[in-house]
Each structure stands twice: as C-alpha cells, then as structure tokens.
UniProtKB/Swiss-Prot annotation:
Active-site residues, as the UniProt record annotates them: K99 (proton acceptor)
Lineage, opening ranks: Bacteria, Bacillati, Bacillota, Bacilli, Bacillales
EC number: 5.3.2.5
Cofactor(s) this protein cannot do without: Mg(2+)
Additional notes on this entry: Has no RuBP-carboxylation activity.
Entry GO MF terms: 2,3-diketo-5-methylthiopentyl-1-phosphate enolase activity; magnesium ion binding; ribulose-bisphosphate carboxylase activity
Cysteine-cysteine disulfides: none
One Pfam family per UniProt: RuBisCO_large
Record keywords, A-Z: Amino-acid biosynthesis, Isomerase, Magnesium, Metal-binding, Methionine biosynthesis
Xref: InterPro entries: Diketo-Methiopentyl-P_enolase (IPR017717), RuBisCO (IPR033966), RuBisCO_lsu_C (IPR000685), RuBisCO_lsu_C_sf (IPR036376), RuBisCO_lsu_fd_N (IPR017443), RuBisCO_lsu_N_sf (IPR036422)
Catalytic reaction annotation: 5-methylsulfanyl-2,3-dioxopentyl phosphate = 2-hydroxy-5-methylsulfanyl-3-oxopent-1-enyl phosphate
SUPFAM superfamilies found in the cross-reference section: RuBisCo, C-terminal domain, RuBisCO, large subunit, small (N-terminal) domain
Pathway, per record: Amino-acid biosynthesis; L-methionine biosynthesis via salvage pathway; L-methionine from S-methyl-5-thio-alpha-D-ribose 1-phosphate: step 3/6
Protein name: 2,3-diketo-5-methylthiopentyl-1-phosphate enolase
C-alpha cells in the first residue's frame, strides 16, 4: 500500500501497547472507527491508519525511576496511507509525528517510504561518487578541516588559513557554521578569494582542495544567496539544515541552478535527537531524512571526540547515508568533533573508506600549524590504509600530533 510506515519506541503507563497503537493510528488519521456507520467506514477505510506491528520490550527500571511511574516499553509500527498527505517532508512529519510528539514518552525512530512515495524525493544531486570525481580522490577517505576563529577577522586572515590547510593536504575546507554574512568577509568575496588561493595551491603543489561556504540569511533569501555563491564560483555549500528546516534543504538541492554539492550541518538537531524517550532517532534525522532531502554530506558527532554519540547511533547514521538504493545516491558520512590523528584507525575501522574525516582543533592546534596538522592526518590515513600502526610511521608531523593528543589506537587491535 502506498504510504509510510512509522516506527516508534513508546513508554506507556496504560500498559496496553496494542490499544495505545490503535489510538495513535486512528487519532492521526480518521479520528474514530468503531462508532462510525458501516457506509462511512467503507468510505474512510482507505484513509485509516493501520497498526502493523506491536512488540513489548524488557522493562528498564532506570526509566521508571526517572519518570516516577511504571511504564511498558515497546516498539509499534503504524502505516499511514499516502492519500492522507501531500508528498513532502512537512506533511509526512506532521502526519507521523505532529501532535503525537507532544503526547508522552514516544520517539520516532524510523520512517519507511513506499517505492512510489520515495520517488518523489530525488535525494543527493551529486553523492559520494561525484564528489570523489571532483577531487580526483577515489581510494581513501576524504579529509576536511574547519575555519576556526573567523569572527572579527578579515579576508586576508581567511586566505592565509585556507592556504595553510590546502598545503597540508586537506581535501575540503568548510566555513564555521556560526560565520554569517558580515562586512569583513562577505559571501561572494569569501568565495572569490578562496578560489584564488586554492587555484594557486593547486598550481604550485598539485593538490586540489574544495571550499564549502556557509549559506545564511532569512529563509526567503537563502535560495538567492546560494545562487550568488554558485555564480561566484563556490565548490560546495554548507547549510544549517535544522535551523531552516529539511524542506528548505530540499528546495536548494532540487534547484538546477544550484549545481554544487550541499553539506548539512547538524546544529540544533541535538534538541530533537538527544533524548532516549522523546524526539527522533539520530539515524532518521541525521541519516535518512537528510539523504532524502538532498544532502551530499551529513555531519554528526563521532563516537570518539568531545561531543560523542554512542557508537551504535553513529554507525546507524552512516549506514542510512550509504546503503545502496536504486533511487537515491549515497551521502558522505562526516563523523565530527574532537577528532585528532590518533583516532584515524578507529574511523577507518568503523566507517570504512567512504567517510570524511573532519577536524578543527586537530588540524589548527598542531604545533606546526594547519599545514602540519593536515600532513599529520594524511600520514595517519595513508599508514592505516597500508596496515601500519601509527607509532611505527616515520613522519615528524604525525609523531608530533601523537605526542600532543595521544595515540588511543596503539593499545587496540584495529
């Protein structure tokens, strides 16, 4: 049947999950059923939500203690017919988790789209393979760094930072998500100056680096700002997808004039995903929905750094971004936050080759500057791909980084 199947984790104090599931299925569709006249039931049957799965899970005493009451935990799945909503994410999310998100301890962990509905979403315009083609990098993870400390700094500072990161071997440099339109580094000037620097580095060193510029402004202006960036020569766009909404991301991704990959930043998403009792699962919001909405890259907290996700959650995000789908291109997973070269073996072990290693302080904080930081990461990536333990690598920049931040992979079998 055409539509969506929503999967929820519920903690219910009525202790009747089947009844609760039926109430949700009716409440979010036709409202009631048993008291309807038979003729009206026949008319409304195609609009009725249907419970397709109910499963009770083991009790968790810590949850009962937290809530101050005893609850029954379970998984419920409800099918919502596509006749009830238009084929767009705002309508789908409001149907499956609109007022329901306000109704007690319930968390939306997955949405399964029927094939006909999925075809309404074109997904990433470029995806992993096309990004690799643009960089001419096919056999290793990509390395990305972040502009740090740009607020209050001018274009000259940006050019110096960008040059050092590119010389260090970084593949992508992105704006900080908190760098908005300002008089010192306006959008088009950032793009043109960045392109000039990166072209110079390419001609001198033979290394190609792409620059992801942050697209900001009022929602009404975002599309025009993105086109301004593209017309100025932007390689990639960074977008705070959850500050604006998934539908705005999709609007940008589907515009044929915005012909560059889009990188979705997870800012604000923690308010939706962090609770085990409420909101969305990490894999749904930062994985599946971003991919459907057209993100070519999805940034999310890694399991290793200073804003860590549980490993299973991070891996589920990556899986939903990269699982082969005949309709959707794959998106790059970008585990982030607190990453230094000593974590590289873990990242490759856990996420494989199709991943972007994203570092801020782990590059800029290197004693030899951003050039040294980039070179340390590249040495760590090359060594890991060759099966060489990092402490055995004869590379001065990597050795310095391991001395400064440690080498957690040394004592662990990778």
């Amino acid at each position: 049947m055409s539509g969506i199947i929503a999967t929820y984790v519920i903690h219910d104090d009525s202790h009747n999950l089947t009844k609760k599931a039926e109430q949700i299925a009716l409440g979010l569709t036709i409202g009631s059923w048993t008291h309807l006249p038979h003729l009206l039931q026949k008319q409304l049957k195609q609009h009725k939500g249907n419970v397709v799965h109910v499963e009770e899970l083991p009790q968790q005493e810590e949850v009962n203690n937290y809530l101050g009451k005893k609850v029954t935990k379970g998984i419920i799945k409800i099918q919502y017919p596509s006749l009830n909503f238009s084929p767009d994410l705002p309508a789908i999310l409001t149907t499956a988790f609109g007022k329901l998100s306000l109704d007690g301890e319930i968390k939306l962990i997955d949405l399964t789209f029927s094939d006909d509905l999925k075809r309404q979403f074109s997904g990433p315009k470029f995806g992993i393979e096309e990004v690799r083609k643009r960089l001419h990098v096919h056999n290793r993870p990509l390395l990305m760094s972040i502009f740090k400390g740009m607020i209050g700094r001018n274009i000259g500072y940006l050019k110096t930072q960008l040059r050092d990161q590119a010389i260090g071997g970084v593949d992508i440099v992105k704006d900080d998500e908190i760098l908005f339109e300002n008089a010192l580094t306006p959008l088009e000037k950032r793009v043109r100056s960045g392109k000039e620097v990166l072209q110079s580095v390419y001609e001198t060193y033979g290394h190609r680096t792409l620059y992801a510029v942050n697209i900001t402004g009022r929602t009404y202006d975002v599309k025009e700002n993105a086109k301004r960036a593209v017309n100025a020569g932007a390689d990639l766009l960074l977008f705070n997808a959850f500050a604006y909404g998934l539908d705005v991301l999709q609007l940008l991704a589907e515009d044929q004039d915005i012909n560059v990959p889009i990188m979705a930043h997870p800012a604000i998403s923690g308010a939706y995903t962090s609770s085990k009792l409420y909101g969305f699962s990490h894999s749904l919001l930062l994985g599946k929905l971003l991919r459907y909405a057209g993100a070519d890259f999805s940034l999310f907290p890694s399991p290793y750094g200073n804003v860590a996700l549980e490993k299973k959650d991070a891996l589920q995000i990556a899986e939903t971004l990269t699982i082969v789908d005949s309709h959707l291109k794959r998106s790059f997973p970008v585990p982030s936050a607190g990453i230094h070269p000593g974590f590289v073996p873990f990242i490759l072990r856990d996420f494989g080759n199709d991943v972007v290693i994203n570092a801020g302080g782990g590059i800029h904080g290197h004693p030899n500057g951003a050039q040294g930081g980039g070179k340390a990461f590249r040495a760590a990536i090359d060594a890991t791909l060759q099966g060489t333990p990092l402490h055995e690598v004869d590379d001065a920049d990597l050795h310095t980084a391991l001395q400064l931040w440690g080498n957690p992979s040394r004592e662990v079998k990778i």
